[in-house]
Amino acid sequence: MSKIFVNPSAIRAGLADLEMAEETVDLINRNIEDNQAHLQGEPIEVDNLPEDMKRLHLDDEKSSNLGEMVRVGEGKYREDFQMDEGEDPNLLFQSYLDNVGVQIVRQMRSGERFLKIWSQTVEEIVSYVTVNFPNPPRRSSEDKSTQTTGRELKKETTSAFSQRESQPSKARMVAQVAPGPPALEWSATNEEDDLSVEAEIAHQIAESFSKKYKFPSRSSGIFLYNFEQLKMNLDDIVKEAKNVPGVTRLAHDGSKIPLRCVLGWVALANSKKFQLLVEADKLSKIMQDDLNRYTSC
C-alpha cells in the first residue's frame, strides 16, 4: 500500500498563509472600528445645549404631510443599502459594516489585492453615509432665533428623500465576490440576453476544454491545468465563470474571454488539488493582467 508524503515546505507555506489571513482579518476589524469611532462618543445632554438651541421648537401640525411625502416614494426603486423609515440608522450602519468586513475577507481569499479592495470599500462606505446620513442645513448667523415650522420640515424631508433617490446604488458592488472596474460592469437585461451570454461563454470554453494553460506553482515553477481536470459540468463552469469581472460584458459583445483567468477563477473556487498546487499571489497577478489585456482591446 503506497503512502502519501507531504512536503514540509508545503505545510510551512500553508501555515504562513493562515497567519497572514488572520493578520489581515485583524487589520480589517481595526479599520472597521476606526470608521465607527464617531458612533462611540458621549451622548449630548440637553442641559448643555446652547440657549439658541433651547428656543427651537416644532409646530404641532398633523403628520398628514409626512404621510403624503412617504406615499410619493411608493412604487419607486429603492436603493439596495437605503434604510427603511423608522429603523435605527446606527444599527443598520453597524450591520452594513459587518457585511462589508465579511465581503472583504471573501475577496481576499479569492486573490484580490487588499489595496484595491479597500479603496473600493471606502468609496462604498462614503456613498452609504452620504445617502443615509445627509448633512443638516446650516443655520443663518443673523437669525439666531429661527423656528422650525412644519413647512420647513416638509421641505427638508423632501430634499433628503430626493437625494436618496438620485444616488447611484453601490451595494451591488459589495455583493459581488470580486468587483471589477465600474466600466466593466454589465448585467443581462432580460432572459434572452442572459441565455445568449451563457451560450457564448460555453462555446469558448468548450473549444478549449482540453487545452492546457500554465499556472505558477508553490515550488517556484509552473504546472499545466485544463478545464477537463475540474471534473465539473460545463453548465456549472459557465455559471461560475459569469462571476469573473468583465466576462459577461465581453461575452455579450461577442469578444474573446480570458480563458486562463476563467479557469484559474473556477479552479480556485472548486478544486482542492488546484489550491494546493498554485501560488495564490502570482495567480492573482496573472488573472488581473489577463483581464486588463482582454478588456482593453
Curated annotation (Swiss-Prot):
Compositional bias (Basic and acidic residues):
139-157
Kindly list the organism's lineage. Answer: Viruses, Riboviria, Orthornavirae, Negarnaviricota, Haploviricotina
GO molecular function, one example? RNA-directed RNA polymerase activity
Native source organism of the sequence:
Rabies virus (strain CVS-11)
Q: What does this protein do?
A: Non catalytic polymerase cofactor and regulatory protein that plays a role in viral transcription and replication. Stabilizes the RNA polymerase L to the N-RNA template and binds the soluble protein N, preventing it from encapsidating non-genomic RNA. Also inhibits host IFN-alpha and IFN-beta signaling by binding and retaining phosphorylated STAT1 in the cytoplasm or by inhibiting the DNA binding of STAT1 in the nucleus. Might be involved, through interaction with host dynein, in intracellular microtubule-dependent virus transport of incoming virus from the synapse toward the cell body.
Tell me the residues on which Phosphoserine occurs: 63-64, 162, 210, 271
Q: Which family does it belong to?
A: Belongs to the lyssavirus protein P family.
Q: What is this protein called?
A: Phosphoprotein
Record keywords, A-Z: Chaperone, Cytoplasmic inwards viral transport, Host cytoplasm, Host nucleus, Host-virus interaction, Inhibition of host innate immune response by virus, Inhibition of host interferon signaling pathway by virus, Inhibition of host STAT1 by virus, Inhibition of host STAT2 by virus, Inhibition of host TBK1 by virus, Inhibition of host TLR pathway by virus, Interferon antiviral system evasion, Microtubular inwards viral transport, Phosphoprotein, Viral immunoevasion, Viral RNA replication, Virion, Virus entry into host cell
- Could you tell me which Pfam families the record lists for this protein? PP_M1
Q: Where is this motif: Nuclear export signal?
A: 49-58
Q: Where is this motif: Nuclear localization signal?
A: 211-214
Identify the stretch(es) annotated as DYNLL1 and DYNLL2 binding.
138-172
List the SUPFAM superfamilies hit by this protein, alphabetically: Phosphoprotein M1, C-terminal domain (SSF118173)
* GO BP, one annotated term: symbiont-mediated suppression of host type I interferon-mediated signaling pathway
Annotated region (Disordered) at 132-177
- Please note every region of biased composition (Polar residues): 158-169
Gene Ontology CC? host cell; host cell cytoplasm; host cell nucleus; virion component
PTM entry text: Phosphorylated by host PKC and by an unknown kinase.
